[in-house]
Amino acid sequence: FHAGLRQSEDILDHCTQEGIGFIPWFPLGNRALVAPDGPLAHIAARHDCTPAQVALAWLLQRSPVVLPIPGTGSLAHLRENCDAALVTLDPEAMAELQTAPEMA
């Protein structure tokens, strides 16, 4: 479950209703989703962050029960992932991500 593949919306909605933690599989999606010139790049530019931070911020704002566990290969990447919690996506970005065509 990530911004490019939202097939578990009904499960997430149920978890949110019941207060059950939801750990999305592969929260950053594929490389194309979070590439510097990928589909999240324009949202990242508007919010002064990276596409990966947009993907994680969307998950964190989507529901308070979402617990993304992104992988990391370096300290810089870990910081980038953690800083996603500081990104607040505007309502337009949230709506765009919620209705964007899916990409596995």
Enumerate the language-model features and the residues they cover.
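Beta/alpha (TIM)-barrel catalytic core signal, keyed to glycine-rich beta->alpha loops juxtaposed to Asp/Glu
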Residues: 1-104
